[in-house]
Amino acid sequence: MAELDPFGAPAGAPGGPALGNGVAGAGEEDPAAAFLAQQESEIAGIENDEAFAILDGGAPGPQAHGEPPGGPDAVDGVMNGEYYQESNGPTDSYAAISEVDRLQSEPESIRKWREEQTERLEALDANSRKQEAEWKEKAVKELEEWYARQDEQLQKTKASNRVADEAFYKQPFADVIGYVTNINHPCYSLEQAAEEAFVNDIDESSPGTEWERVARLCDFNPKSSKQAKDVSRMRSVLISLKQAPLVH
């Protein structure tokens, strides 16, 4: 009885002719082992080809131009007839997909509105910068005018004060109160001012005012400590003569 091989085919007699599919007898290579070895060789070749295509970053290399990755149904990465190739990892891929989705889903009216808004904001910024420059220039001009008005008002006030001083020192007893306006020397004393006022009054004197002019030269302050002698009696006499001059 003939022996069976692993696939169930009867083995021929030793030295006999080849059987069935032309495989030799028991002394030749096993067909199953040859098939398994061929499959392992093909798988190893495919793995080696894919290994050479891996880039340094770990992402698969770019595929040939044509069908996008993932087959005909993968249209998310298509833009202008060409598919997007990932270059810098998943972040760029997600950003590109989001941008493509936005461009594909954004209506023309919204895109036009966004452009108009950009132009309007630029115009507003330019207008605000122009107004700011004008306001600064106007503020500088108004400040200069304010300083000019202040200086003019100060000069007028000084002139008015000088006129008021002259009018004040021309009235009676001005020599006792203070200096006259035409005194420029710092050592000009109150007595010298009173004497000058008395000399000026001589030409303008009228009858009956002699004792009044004399009283101007006297210090009627009872608390004065400059006097060494008691002159209260003389003071009272001069006051009475001032009030009731002697009749000649």
From Swiss-Prot:
It is found in: Cytoplasmic vesicle membrane; Membrane, Coated pit; Cytoplasm, Cytoskeleton, Spindle. It comes from the Eukaryota. This is Clathrin light chain A. Residues 100-162 are annotated as: Involved in binding clathrin heavy chain. Residues 13-25 have a biased composition (Gly residues). Belongs to the clathrin light chain family. Keywords: Acetylation, Calcium, Cell cycle, Cell division, Coated pit, Cytoplasm, Cytoplasmic vesicle, Cytoskeleton, Membrane, Mitosis, Phosphoprotein. The keyword Protein biosynthesis does not apply. The modification Phosphoserine is found at S105, S206, S236. The modification N6-acetyllysine is found at K223, K242. The keyword Zinc-finger does not apply. Its main location: membrane. Pfam families: Clathrin_lg_ch. Clathrin is the major protein of the polyhedral coat of coated pits and vesicles. Acts as a component of the TACC3/ch-TOG/clathrin complex proposed to contribute to stabilization of kinetochore fibers of the mitotic spindle by acting as inter-microtubule bridge. GO terms for cellular component: clathrin coat; clathrin coat of coated pit; clathrin coat of trans-Golgi network vesicle; clathrin complex; clathrin vesicle coat; clathrin-coated endocytic vesicle membrane; clathrin-coated pit; clathrin-coated vesicle. Clathrin coats are formed from molecules containing 3 heavy chains and 3 light chains. Interacts with CALY; the interaction stimulates clathrin self-assembly and clathrin-mediated endocytosis. Interacts with CKAP5 and TACC3 forming the TACC3/ch-TOG/clathrin complex located at spindle inter-microtubules bridges; the complex implicates clathrin triskelions. Residues 1-93 are annotated as: Disordered. It is a peripheral membrane protein. GO terms for molecular function: clathrin heavy chain binding; GTPase binding; peptide binding; protein-containing complex binding; structural molecule activity. The gene is Clta. GO terms for biological process: cell division; clathrin coat assembly; clathrin-dependent endocytosis; endocytosis; intracellular protein transport; synaptic vesicle endocytosis. It comes from Rattus norvegicus.
